[in-house]
Amino acid sequence: MAPAWSFLLSLLLLSCNAICSLGCHLPHTHSLANRRVLMLLQQLRRVSPSSCLQDRNDFEFLQEALGGSQLQKAQAISVLHEVTQHTFQLFSTEGSPATWDKSLLDKLRAALDQQLTDLQACLTQEEGLRGAPLLKEDSSLAVRKYFHRLTLYLQEKRHSPCAWEVVRAEVMRAFSSSTNLQESFRRKD
């Protein structure tokens, strides 16, 4: 899982750097929304991560699949949008653990939906300026495959509480990195 984590960190660094340098500036509230998503994801935890160590998995989120350093800055916001969209869909599935607090899950979905709205506004503005979609097909396919692997993993594990804990932790690390990096770039500006 270490290679996946390091790649996610690299991707989010590129994404946050790009977001800070695009003509479309996401409001400070976007960083606060990331923190809210993190808080809600943390509150959803019902299983001790240490009891799920045998269920950990490497979801193969490869740097080459998304173009790595080849990813243009303007495309990073598209990647972030696609990741947020798939996260929303993942946590909207019927297989969500019954042990999760429904009101927390609803709040998480609402927070993700607000982020999608903010990101979509930036995408629309950037695509209008450039006249073409920002996300390369390879990047889009890599994100879809990654989330497909998460979904298959949940199905293979029959949506067990430990499987959801592994997926929840994977998503939480991504949002944590995103929040920290956005704030560090904001301080530099």
UniProtKB/Swiss-Prot annotation:
One of its GO terms (biological process) is defense response to virus. Disulfide bonds join C24-C122, C52-C162. GO terms for molecular function: cytokine activity; type I interferon receptor binding. SMART domains: IFabd. Belongs to the alpha/beta interferon family. PANTHER family: INTERFERON ALPHA-5, TYPE I INTERFERON. This is Interferon alpha-A. It comes from Bos taurus. The lineage of its organism: Eukaryota, Metazoa, Chordata, Craniata, Vertebrata.
